[in-house]
Amino acid sequence: MKKMSIVGAQWGDEGKGKVVNYFSEKFEWIVRFSGGANAGHTIYYKDKKYVNHMLPSIMPNSQSKGFLGAGMVLDLEKLVEELNILEADFPGMSSKFYIDLEAFLVLPWHKEEDEIIESMRKKPIGTTKRGIGPAYTDKVSREGIKLYYLFDEKMLKERLEDIYYLKSSLYGNKLKTSKDDVFEYLMKTKNELEKLKINYASAVEMGNVFRSTSVLFEGAQGVLLDLDFGTYPFVTSSSCMAHGVSSVGFSTFELDEVYGVLKAYTTRVGSGPFPTEIFGEEAHKIRELGKEYGATTGRPRRVGWLDLPALRYAKIRSGLTGLVITKADVLNGLDKIKVCTHYEVNGKTKDTPSSSYDFFVAKPIYTELNGWKDTNDINFLKYLSYIEEQIGVDIDYISYGPKTEEMCSKNDLILNMENK
């Protein structure tokens, strides 16, 4: 049975949620394998907008089920909120979701820590202040709380006692959240989840299920925000690449396809290097047409031209076998469109960054292509072909609007052009 992974090929916000929705009816399981409430995946169903930060992107009318894997850090309050929104419109939908008992939790003091640490930095790194970084830090330093602790109150209280002792020693009176506050929060959200009839499982239990059926693995953020290979330190705290499926007990060798999602241009939220960034009226126009404001933070996204060296880097790092291009319609009507083909790095021309260091010092080298009136224009097809030739991976699907149905295969696009 087919196994596919969808990952962001840029700095996140590429439209992965919509792409997952488009494919979801072909898969029995949609699995989130990393990240937390710092991701914002927007979907449209019957002209209504839903923004999921925690939940896998499955359509309400789909037979697919969703799994939240152990590589995530779960904000249970946000999870309950999202489930309640879906339940109000689609009663019983919560029972389609399963949570890995091995997943770590974002706790109230993690959000406090996020604020405290960001305020102490000489230069902010642009955290979403959702507690993601501190939660992953606790995971690595063995100070975290896993979901299964909620089902053993004695063990939970002992763990909270130990963790609070350390945190109060580190932060003193700056930390306002007590261990009792956290315990009450966890019991409250646990009860709310039980009322919603969400399911609990583990990747060990689900391993045979996943291997005997079709699974779509939904990545969060993008390759250039990956903890190991992104523009460190301006990155997220987890894996954004296909190899993140290991947190669900899978290997990348078990994946049949890895699709990278990219915009027809480039955006970035927060601080960090951005070689093709543009400013002024040109940037403002693209930002407004593309509604480039963060689904999680509402922050205006930085905007730039398409960056082919960054895409080549993403292809190599995440083993991309196909591409999906989104927001193609945003560039409609422009006479000329710039594309970065190479970087100049310390006086040398490079087609692909050697490491994430290159992003910090790169000067973009551009070529200029003819624009298009709409996505049925031959110049748009030439734009796609140019990207394919440069990257060495086919663009198989095109998104030209926010709704799930505003997407087609490249073959259908060509047929439509030929029939006009």
Swiss-Prot record:
Protein family: Belongs to the adenylosuccinate synthetase family.
Family annotation (InterPro entries): Adenylosuccin_syn_GTP-bd, Adenylosuccin_syn_Lys_AS, Adenylosuccinate_synth_dom1, Adenylosuccinate_synth_dom2, Adenylosuccinate_synth_dom3, Adenylosuccinate_synthetase, P-loop_NTPase
Residue positions binding IMP: 13-16, 38-41, 128, 142, 221, 236, 299
PANTHER family, alphabetized: ADENYLOSUCCINATE SYNTHETASE (PTHR11846:SF0)
Active site, renumbered: 13, 41
NCBIfam families: PRK01117.1 (NF002223), PRK13783.1 (NF010355), purA (TIGR00184)
Documented EC number(s): 6.3.4.4
Name of the protein in question: Adenylosuccinate synthetase
Cofactor (UniProt): Mg(2+)
SMART domains noted in UniProt: Adenylsucc_synt (SM00788)
Pathway entry: Purine metabolism; AMP biosynthesis via de novo pathway; AMP from IMP: step 1/2
Group of enzyme by EC: ligase
Residues annotated to bind GTP: 12-18, 40-42, 301, 327-329, 399-401
Comment on bound cofactor: Binds 1 Mg(2+) ion per subunit.
GO cellular component: cytoplasm
Function: Plays an important role in the de novo pathway of purine nucleotide biosynthesis. Catalyzes the first committed step in the biosynthesis of AMP from IMP.
